[in-house]
Design a protein with these regions (language model features):
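Catalytic zinc-binding patch centered on the HExxH motif and its immediate surroundings
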Residues: 317-322, 356-376
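Short pre-active-site segment immediately N-terminal to the catalytic Zn-binding motif
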Residues: 319-324, 375-395, 409
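Long, K/E/R/D-enriched contiguous segments that form extended
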Residues: 293, 297-340, 369, 380, ...
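A well-structured
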Residues: 1-316
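Post-HEXXH active-site segment of zinc metalloproteases
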Residues: 404-422
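Catalytic glutamate of the conserved HExxH
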Residues: 393-397, 401, 405
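Conserved oxyanion/phosphate-binding beta-strand-loop segments in alpha/beta enzyme cores
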Residues: 62-65, 242-243, 350, 354-363
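Acidic/histidine-enriched, beta-strand-rich ligand/metal-binding domains
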Residues: 343, 349-353, 422
Length: 422
């Protein structure tokens, strides 16, 4: 790969590092190896007793991690292929297949998790935790703390099985729908008004940062018109996902509130998060003052929703267009100024061709960094359109990738950063 980043163009990622060909015999053998390891792990149920040795306990954790890594590789390939083209029936079918496999494997090894959470006594659990390598200890302590929210093995299996065709299926339907949306905006072109068609939301939303107020308004109206037209179906998707979340978390598991589920998963207590929210509510006037001042700088009596992201002048950064190559070069130089290792790690992502940066129809919108396993270079999805916010998004997602690579010596069980840290 060339090191002349200034000439780099947007492109697609290469996910063959994960799976060369999902229809090949090699991939079938890979999935078969997962089945063999799961069967071996299932045999460990008979040796789970309070006085199990810490060596045996650690061996089981390592077996479980090995199974999880293989599932992550197969699932990662399926998801990344689907995000690159949500209209692909082949990609969608593979996602369903991998989700079903992951659910089945999870159900078959679930007994170990529930045993450690609920069946072993406090003294023996503490003995095992203190003898295990230090990187696992906090994770295992947290499992014991949240044990009261676990259900019986059979109940957990039912929930896991139904998720594949329940909330996860609804999310895929949402992605397929919204990624296929097409938009038409009425824009001024010289003295004429033209109807411009957009087959991707990302291109349309670039206009909300246009220095032209009419273009910003036209972009929002076009966006909202399409979503309003589909509000019935989208509303049903939202409602059903929310109801499923609440029914499981509150009615079945006994969490105090829906947000408590997320807080506890992030190892935070509700009081801490509520203090943060209370501080935001108390100081909401600061945001009001900001928008009043922005309205004044834009020469508007009132700042409408259409103009929240308006650049304050035609010379502002959001009015400037950046080539992809110059954006990459700017970010890499910034990383190097902070620490040469940051640049080196970011360059590895480009060298591996793990970036999908172009805007195209049916590709998932937004941006993310996807870390599959600790020993694999992360993947980054962008929708680069040349705005300053696209440059900052590039830097942001590569920051996640650098974080993942710096954590590559950690085991999969504790490798991923929790949301508050990420």
């Amino acid at each position: 790969m060339t090191s002349n980043y200034a000439d780099m163009k947007v492109g697609r990622w290469d996910i063959t590092d994960l799976v060369k060909d999902p229809s090949s015999g090699e991939f079938s053998q890979f999935l078969g190896s997962i089945e063999e390891q799961v069967m071996q792990f299932e045999e460990s149920r008979k040796i789970l007793r309070p006085d199990i040795s810490h060596e045996e306990f650690e061996r089981l954790i390592l077996m479980l991690e090995n199974i999880s890594e293989k599932i992550s590789v197969a699932s990662g390939y399926a998801y990344l292929g689907y995000y690159a083209d949500t209209s692909s029936n082949e990609a969608s079918a593979l996602v369903i297949k991998m989700e079903k496999l992951a659910s089945e494997v999870s159900n078959r090894v679930l007994f170990f998790d529930l045993w450690f959470k609920k069946e072993i006594d406090h003294d023996n659990a503490s003995r095992l935790i203190s003898a295990i390598p230090v990187m696992y200890r906090e994770h295992l302590r947290h499992k014991r703390l949240v044990a009261k929210y676990s259900l019986s093995e059979q109940e957990e299996k039912v929930i896991s099985t139904l998720e594949v065709t329940g909330s996860r299926a609804l999310v895929k339907i949402y992605d397929k729908m919204t990624s296929s949306f097409e938009f038409t905006a009425k824009l001024r072109h010289g003295r004429k008004m033209i109807m411009k068609r957009f087959d991707n939301k990302e291109k349309l939303m670039s206009l909300v940062r246009s220095p032209d107020a009419d273009r910003r308004e036209a972009a929002y109206k076009s966006l909202l018109q399409v979503y309003k037209k589909n509000s019935g179906v989208l509303g049903e998707i939202y409602q059903n996902i929310i109801m499923q979340w609440r029914d499981e978390a509150i009615s079945m598991r006994g969490y105090r509130s829906p947000i408590s589920v997320r807080n506890i998963a992030n190892n935070l207590d509700d009081i801490t998060v509520e203090a943060l929210l209370a501080a935001c509510r108390k100081n909401v006037s600061i945001f009001h003052e900001y928008f009043v001042e922005k309205s004044r700088m834009l020469g508007m009596k009132k700042l409408h929703r259409y103009h929240l992201y308006a650049p304050i002048s035609k010379k502002a950064a959001d009015s400037k267009k950046f080539s992809y190559g110059s954006a990459v070069e700017t970010v890499l130089n910034s990383f190097e100024n902070f620490d040469p290792q940051f640049r080196s790690l970011a360059e590895r992502v480009f060298a591996k061709r793990h970036v999908d940066s172009e805007i195209r129809k049916a590709k998932r919108g937004g941006a993310f960094c996807y870390s599959v396993t600790p020993n694999l270079t992360p993947y980054i999805l962008l929708n680069f359109d040349g705005l300053s916010r696209d440059v900052s998004t590039l830097a942001h997602e590569f920051g996640h990738a650098i974080h993942s690579m710096l954590a590559s010596e950690m085991p999969l069980m504790v490798f991923h950063a929790p949301l508050p840290l990420a």
